[in-house]
Amino acid sequence: MSLTASAASAALTLLADGPDDGSKRPWRPNDPVKEQRDLYTQFVISTALGLSAFLAFCILRPKWTELYAARRRQRNAASRLPELPDTLFGWIPVLHQITEEEVLQSAGLDAYVFLSFFKFAIRFLLAVFIFAVAIILPMHYKYTGQYGVPGWDNPPGNKTTSPIDGSEKEKPVTDPAYLWIYVLFAYVFSGLAIYMLLDETKVIIRTRQTYLGNQTSTTDRTIRLSGIPHDLGTEDKIKEFVEGLRVGKVESITVCRKWRELDELIDERMKVIRELERAWTKHIGYKRPKNDGNALPLTEQQPRDADDERSGLLSGHDNEHVSGYSNERPKVRIWYGLFKLRFRMIDAIDYYEEKLRKIDEYIQNAREKEYRTTEIAFVTMESIAASQMLVQAILDPHPMQMFARLAPAPADVIWKNTYLSRTRRMVQSWSITFVIGFLTVFWSVLLVPIASLLELKTLETIVPRLAEFLQEHPIIKSLVQTGLPTLAFSLLTVAVPYLYEWLSNNQGMVSRGDVELSVISKNFFFSFFNLFLLFTVFGTASGFYGFWESLRDAFKDSTTIALALANSLEGLAPFYINLLILQGLGLFPFRLLEFGSVALYPFQFLSARTPREYAELSTPPKFSYGFSIPQTILILVICVVYSVFPSSWLICLFGLIYFTVGKFIYKYQLLYAMDHQQHSTGRAWPMICNRVFVGLLVHQLAMIGVLALRRAITRSLLLVPLLGFTVWFSYWFGRTYEPLMKFIALKSINRDQPGGGDISPSPSSTLSPPSGLDRDSLPIRIGGQDLELRLKKYVNPSLIVPLHAAWLPGRNPARGNGNGASAFEVHQTQNV
């Protein structure tokens, strides 16, 4: 279960466990025995789950290298990494010793930045944990008698009971002077977070500038021009305009055109060729070759037989029927007539071969057509310095014209969006942004009423026998009230990030890297607003109407948020402790097993029929920063918000475990197991920093609310300048540091190498085999198939992709009809 699902389920359980007396009083946990039992149960179960998953991975890793070492087997850049031993635990120190430089060279800047965030979080939480244990915990215990451990802290009364020896003692009298720790450590932790964040940012900027300044790829020398007026809509006029700025020479220009017809033909061809391959395979049969045990058990098949004979029989290009096979030639149903009400059965192989031949003719004719130009062009300069000067300058005195941006990698371009008009892209973008905002803000409106059905009082009305049984068995009651929300809402909350990803893909963005950054932003907003802020600020509402009243009051008066935060956070501490234990100890190790890929593999294997479909089974699982980064930021925000509360030491301890385990697991996945095709050159770091600033603001608001509730008005007002400083600093950070995370400084460019300064790199072909990791090495993806080649120039793949023949047993798909097949080699997974 993801963080989204587990957090939503647990939060709904908290709402369901609210007061049953119908009052609107705030809910407070008042059963120390239950809380202590839940904490121990959560810890034991999570530890058992995590250790089981980790041991299972250690056993299966050397056996299922096709899954757990998929990236290293198929990526040249990953092949430079050290070979991991096949022993049970021997791979752990080898992985730990891989340096940040090796991570950068193998997985790129995105992986380097992502793991740097874990390093920052570990450093920060370690410092907070030391302060919490050495100062904050003793202060809280001395003046309030609170340990910060669920079940140990006592309810209000004249005496307290020691959880260690059971002895009774007088309850400490609260001294208002101790409230200064909320003021002091709000400043200390905010300053510490900003200092460490700036320190890590400087390291990332220095690494990024050095790394990109020494690149000579086509991507680094290319800009994307948008808003091109009609009178400058040709290559020659654009070249004249750019070179007239006297910043450098133009190497090549690609003006985007309205290629919709051609793109649709290529997509249709891929569908037809797959149907043809299935028809042939159904007729002649195919079994995947047996491997040496490095794949999942379901891939253990008997070797093919008589492939050489079949290859000879299939080498002809006529439509003569091939006989001698046990299976009959398949048939396909063709509908015709008025309203397509009549049909007839015809030979499927003949039908799809004829359809493929006609589509190939249409494609050849479409490639020779002249298409209308759009307002977008990719301009490749002869030097990186020239391209950087263009993107960092205003090129035209007219607004919204000749606007230069950094270009994505050639294979990262979403070509179908390049021929959308600017108005169409803006309408799509703002419409989907409005839809996502509406869904995110009002998502909890759908969850809170359903949660009320899980209250014991409601169950007594609907299912009285079940309510009586649960009342008699508190452990089963706890499991049921936790499991039912999980069952009801986990699928819904897991589906939300995928819904946002689909919506982001329809916003009209030109590159997949921009889409992923958009997914990061949207998913964090959903997680932060719905699973933290709403359930914390309005978590005291009892029922649906109470929730609506709290929401209405918050919009009327902003101080309600600070007071509600302070009023709810301390009571929700057991929930967040359990959440951190579950995520860090229980669920994180399951990421190593790639349980989703393993669970889906049998269905994918059973549905595979053709050589192409079997080869696609071995492609590495895709890693998405859009799903991973928002969850980790939210965990850090929770730890920051609770950094001064009595339970700060416990929350920071399990947060520290979460980030330590997470860094290790993500390091393995990014380097060895999973593939990430979009490369945004580390541009996610400013987004991470801005969301950390949001966490600091929430922390400061909570401290203001805590002091205000304790009538320490003067001390709460002393935190207002810190609040203003954080807002100002986030603005200053964006103006000062973010440009260095987006552009390459001219001083950082290595002008002694080809393509760096005024020296033009040697001309290269349009396509060449990949060598190492750079932004030109992203594989071209046509019809869901990765091709083992890279584009060296900006050109729509539909214009140049070879029209291969069907990929049949015993015949290389590249030996097709000769339409440029020699320039390509289809990537086929090798079973080493």
Curated annotation (Swiss-Prot):
Signal peptide bounds: none
Glycosylation sites: N158, N214
The protein, known as: Vacuolar transmembrane transporter penV
Subcellular location: Vacuole membrane
Keywords of the record: Amino-acid transport, Glycoprotein, Membrane, Transmembrane, Transmembrane helix, Transport, Vacuole
Low complexity biased stretches: 759-771
Basic and acidic residues composition-biased segments: 302-321
Region (Disordered): 152-171, 291-322, 754-777
UniProt GO molecular function: calcium-activated cation channel activity
Organism: Penicillium rubens (strain ATCC 28089 / DSM 1075 / NRRL 1951 / Wisconsin 54-1255)
Source superkingdom: Eukaryota
Transcription among keywords: no
Function: Vacuolar transmembrane transporter that participates in the first stage of the beta-lactam biosynthesis (the formation of the ACV tripeptide), probably taking part in the supply of amino acids from the vacuolar lumen to the vacuole-anchored ACV synthetase.
